[in-house]
Amino acid sequence: MSQGKIVQIIGAVVDVEFQRNEVPKVYHALKVEGTAITLEVQQQLGDGVVRTIALGSTDGLKRNLLATNTERAISVPVGAGTLGRIMDVLGRPIDEAGDVQASDHWEIHRAAPSYEDQSSSTELLETGIKVIDLMCPFAKGGKVGLFGGAGVGKTVNMMELINNIAKAHSGLSVFAGVGERTREGNDFYHEMKDSNVLDKVAMVYGQMNEPPGNRLRVALTGLTMAEYFRDEKDASGKGKDVLLFVDNIYRYTLAGTEVSALLGRMPSAVGYQPTLAEEMGVLQERITSTKSGSITSIQAVYVPADDLTDPSPATTFAHLDSTVTLSRNIASLGIYPAVDPLDSTSRQMDPLVIGHEHYDTAQRVQQTLQKYKELKDIIAILGMDELSEEDKQSVSRARKIERFFSQPFHVAEVFTGSPGKYVSLKDTIRGFKAICDGEYDHLPEQAFYMVGSIEEAVEKANKMSAKA
């Protein structure tokens, strides 16, 4: 193994000089002697000098320290030994529970599966969240994005999805915390522990306080662990179905921007790295299902200043099967989850995939909400009395639908005091179909707020009339 010496340190960027005939390849990992720091080669500058990004704090590094070329990319532990553990970007345990007992180590830079190995599925993944199941259903083995600005509930929605899917799902889950709050990572660990599913979850964290190199690579570390579970065949020749949760994809892009600036690349639109589309593609193309197993991924995507045309969320859109858009306007009405049913999409929205009843109900709900949206200006200027009877009925049903989309979450029980509700897809379709048919026109709209199934809304209305 060749050795070089550090010649320059600028923040997280470290230049290392090697003999000209022993220059490491791009993405090879270097170990710095006397420290726990790993460097990843990003550029070859010529004359035997390589420019690297430090995966860890560069405090205490100095010139002329020796760096050894490991002659391979960063490798992380994979397999059953990672389950129930919290690891950093290099696969080192950070949960103070001893070493990770891994059967194998895989490099984090890998090629995406070939076209002939990939497979697509039209099987629906029920989430128990009414607005998602009805308006933007998820596919098993698909990619889902939760888009939203600051404070509209991306992480809470993701935690509820983990609660509803990962606990009911008998397969394995991998959670990659990319540049998010350490507190949320801690909460997630205890949530999994309390619900006895910790032994089915591998957790990889590169949080807000870590250098950009860690935040840029931690998503790849988590993905590599998920790929192992998908590709490693059991006795029957099948891999596993894996859930991959990434919170937050925007921080992955942001870390790429920081690294790009540190490496001296010319920024492109809004200051992002010129390689934004390529970096996103490298990650997203690997998150796919093969003939042996599947990866279903749910990714939170922060939307800077609520602008969906920002290059980062706009680049992410192209890779997803379902997009769940969280709206600040809906959150301001106190309707949670604050999903915008008119702005959320799904490739599964096809009568041949989800069935005619589901498709027709979703279309009717969408038309009713769209009509209400168009009438809002008239109502604001002239008031409800100026509307025709038909329009009044549409507005009344739309307001009931809006409120019926709200739902108490299991993960928010501690804040709200009301028990969480899981609503099956069948009950969801039945409830919204009945509202559109006018079966509940006589009930007050408050009865539909924060309930589970339609029966609970009727019960709530009866209680309200009894009190009155």
From Swiss-Prot:
Q: Name one GO molecular function term.
A: proton-transporting ATP synthase activity, rotational mechanism
Listed under catalytic activity are: ATP + H2O + 4 H(+)(in) = ADP + phosphate + 5 H(+)(out)
Gene3D superfamilies attached to this UniProt entry: 2.40.10.170, Bovine Mitochondrial F1-atpase, Atp Synthase Beta Chain, Chain D, domain 3, P-loop containing nucleotide triphosphate hydrolases
Signal peptide region = none
The family database entries (CDD domains) matched by this protein are listed as: ATP-synt_F1_beta_C (cd18110), ATP-synt_F1_beta_N (cd18115), F1-ATPase_beta_CD (cd01133)
Its taxonomic path starts at:
Bacteria, Pseudomonadati, Pseudomonadota, Gammaproteobacteria, Lysobacterales
Q: Name one GO cellular component term.
A: plasma membrane
Q: How does it sit in the membrane?
A: Peripheral membrane protein
Q: Keywords in UniProt for this one?
A: ATP synthesis, ATP-binding, Cell inner membrane, Cell membrane, CF(1), Hydrogen ion transport, Ion transport, Membrane, Nucleotide-binding, Translocase, Transport
State the name under which the record lists this protein: ATP synthase subunit beta
* Highest taxon above the source species: Bacteria
Q: What is its main location?
A: membrane
Q: Does the keyword Repeat apply?
A: no
| Enzyme nomenclature, EC number | 7.1.2.2
